[in-house]
């Protein structure tokens, strides 16, 4: 059972209230080749009378691939889909944090344009989130963090953003653990619980990891980085985890997660896919 815990000082930096989830909370995943075990993709369907639906968004990880979220958010803004809360995983936590401030796709694009390179990630986060508190956000925000010492997953959702987010973005191949914490990639139940507790009635997963289609994020299946992405993606896209819609953006396998110099290519290649899939989803929900 999920528990909402009030926490005191989190690692001497974060004074926050967190949704804590233990290993036993993570859904059991039964391997199968049956595609009916996955969330339905956005397909044309009769218009549902659910225009009052309130959407919670999970921004999955993917390093530079998360720049594709700019185009998705612009389409969400275009169709005026009501977003009530957001959760970010790995680099998706940065996008979610910026978006939660003013629910603006243009602001996300502007802040991402300030990124110089992975070696400057710490200064970048301090710069764009300086003096930004979760209490001042327009919609609730959380990011997924796994503490390696106590093997516990948290939804960090209270405190200063520049202090919270570093605990949520480390991943193999790019960043070392931050204060014994890395991005929690598999605790979908914790993310869904937080979004629903924040008022969401429909959960959307934004996925820029094409490993599910046999196109890994790195060139070799033997790499630990690629094994990490495939494992996390296999959990994210299962139907039994409470996700209602999945927006898949298929980006060239040549653009690996750590190739931040290819941000423009990600933006260009994701635009038509974002337009097509969001048009279908908006129609499905009556927008």
Question: What is each of the regions a protein language model found here?
Answer:
Residues 17-89, 98-287:
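Patatin-like phospholipase
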Residues 92-93:
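Catalytic nucleophile loop
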Residues 4-13:
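Sec-dependent N-terminal signal peptides
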